[in-house]
Every structure is written in structure tokens, then in C-alpha cells.
Amino acid sequence: MVFVRSRLLMAAAALVMLVGATPWNPSTALATDSTKVVVKDFMFSPTTSTVMAGSTVTWTNLDDEPHTVLSDTGLFKSGAMDTNESFSFKFDKPGTYHFTCTIHPRMVGTIVVQ
């Protein structure tokens, strides 16, 4: 009985250590079908999203100021989005895509497509 209890305690401790060692970054998101990027407080959140090829990313402006989304290669470009307006783009090819707000160039983000 003591042996079984000891093994259960060791297994529980190992599980806690494994979960605690798993990195988690709140500024990064992973999605398979679609993901959302919130535009608020003059920043994109999350700043980096990782999605599977074929996924759609939707940016929604929750600021009181207009914002845009423009890829550094020109692959996708929104118009000015007012409060509560959205822009979506489907990412078909793997790669890393950087984007910015053309109105506020310090607002930047990245989409990683796997």
C-alpha cells in the first residue's frame, strides 16, 4: 500500500514539474483554422500568431482611432478600420509574415504559417 501511494505521489510530482516546465507566452497564439488579432491601445495582440496553412486571421480594431494592417511584402492590406471594424486574410502558404499599421508605424506584428 505504501509502495502504491509512493508511486502515485512521484507521478503527480513529475506531472507538476512537466507542466511547470512548459513555456507559455501570452503574446503568442497558435491556431489551426482561424485566429483573431485584437487592435487595442495602439498595439496588436497577440503580437505573434502561429497558424496552420489554410487558416484565416482576422484583425479587429477595438481602439477609438482608425488602424490599418499592411504586410511588409504587400501580400495583404486593409483599408482604414474604424472602431469595431475587421479585416481578414487567409494564409495559404507556410512562411513568416510581418505586418504594421500604416497610420501608426510602431504598431507591428507577425504571423507564422506552418
Label each PLM-derived region with a short phrase:
Residues V2-A11, V16-Q114:
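Extracytoplasmic copper-binding redox domains, predominantly the cupredoxin/blue-copper superfamily
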